[in-house]
């Protein structure tokens, strides 16, 4: 999808949005992975293990 062009009705029908509920989960944002393959975006955000947490 190119944001520089006008969206067609076809593009609008194909757009999807998803929200994922995230409760008290710590994630490693610097280790996330985004892969676009055949028009499908796959997102992997690993959880931080309890012993790896650096917060106070």
From Swiss-Prot:
Domain of life: Eukaryota
Chief place where the protein resides: mitochondrion
Induction of its expression: By heat shock, and under other conditions of stress, such as increased salt concentration and starvation.
Localization of this protein: Mitochondrion
One Gene Ontology CC term in the entry: mitochondrion
Keyword terms of this UniProt record: Mitochondrion, Stress response
Similarity comment: family membership: Belongs to the small heat shock protein (HSP20) family.
Its job: May play a protective role against oxidative stress.
Protein name: Heat shock 22 kDa protein, mitochondrial
Species in which this protein is naturally found: Solanum lycopersicum
Lineage of producing organism: Eukaryota, Viridiplantae, Streptophyta, Embryophyta, Tracheophyta
